[in-house]
Amino acid sequence: MSITAEKKQEVIQSNARAEGDTGSPEVQVAILTSRIQTLTEHFKSHHKDNHSRRGLLMMVNKRRSLLDYLKKKDVERYNALIQKLGLRK
């Protein structure tokens, strides 16, 4: 249900603002998005797994709050990130 270390490093490198950046909101949102997508696939075959569903909802809420923070601080970075990750239609 979690993402592999290689996948996580790939996500970090593709969204980092600078070398070694792991804490910026963009990277955190990208990692959460990857984990959310993995859990969404998990629920297609395990629809009664309510314990993991709670974790999914917490991740979605954390991502939402990080996106709200980024939108408040820098709208251009926010728009670029949601475009890159395909979060809005």
Swiss-Prot record:
Keywords assigned by UniProt, alphabetized: Ribonucleoprotein, Ribosomal protein, RNA-binding, rRNA-binding
SMART domains listed in its UniProt record: Ribosomal_S15
Keyword Cell division tagged: no
InterPro entries in the record: Ribosomal_uS15, Ribosomal_uS15_bac-type, uS15_NS1_RNA-bd_sf
GO biological process: translation
Annotated Basic and acidic residues bias: 1-10
Region span, Disordered: 1-24
GO MF terms, alphabetically ordered: rRNA binding; structural constituent of ribosome
Pfam families per the UniProt record, alphabetical: Ribosomal_S15
Entry keyword Plastid: no
Entry GO terms, CC: cytosolic small ribosomal subunit
Chain's role: One of the primary rRNA binding proteins, it binds directly to 16S rRNA where it helps nucleate assembly of the platform of the 30S subunit by binding and bridging several RNA helices of the 16S rRNA.
PANTHER family the UniProt entry points to: RIBOSOMAL PROTEIN S15, BACTERIAL AND ORGANELLAR, SMALL RIBOSOMAL SUBUNIT PROTEIN US15M
Similarity-based family: Belongs to the universal ribosomal protein uS15 family.
NCBIfam families, alphabetized: S15_bact
HAMAP family listed in its UniProt record: Ribosomal_uS15_B
Binding partners and assembly: Part of the 30S ribosomal subunit. Forms a bridge to the 50S subunit in the 70S ribosome, contacting the 23S rRNA.
Protein name listed in UniProt: Small ribosomal subunit protein uS15
Organism: Novosphingobium aromaticivorans (strain ATCC 700278 / DSM 12444 / CCUG 56034 / CIP 105152 / NBRC 16084 / F199)
Gene this protein is translated from: rpsO
